[in-house]
């Protein structure tokens, strides 16, 4: 079955293990890792919150090289892209509530998941804040920039609720 597969083919795979930032699936007897960024359009903190061992998942083959054992699968094509209609829910200058879900290493700030559309934003914490927000704290933020093509939303922290 593997030699018959081509790029852009749609296949159904079974989840055999779930990690924090990836899942392990079985593709016609071959074990393949799918990273969290290839599963959904939004930021995934923990894959265990979304996927369960034994579930089946519809994926598209992005890259396949059987001789070198290279497989790149993506489930993004079969999920709704919330950034496509993001300006219906969010506007620049608007204030929104969300919860702190991560602290990125390469960028300064925090990652906040908004309550309403369920998307994530990179938020700056102003220097005037004495107490830095903690994991899962509820916060009020103001949006400063929306980049639909890059799937990025920026803002700054107003206050911890």
Model-flagged regions — what are they?
Residues 1-161:
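Single-stranded RNA-binding regions, centering on S1/OB-family and related RNA-binding modules
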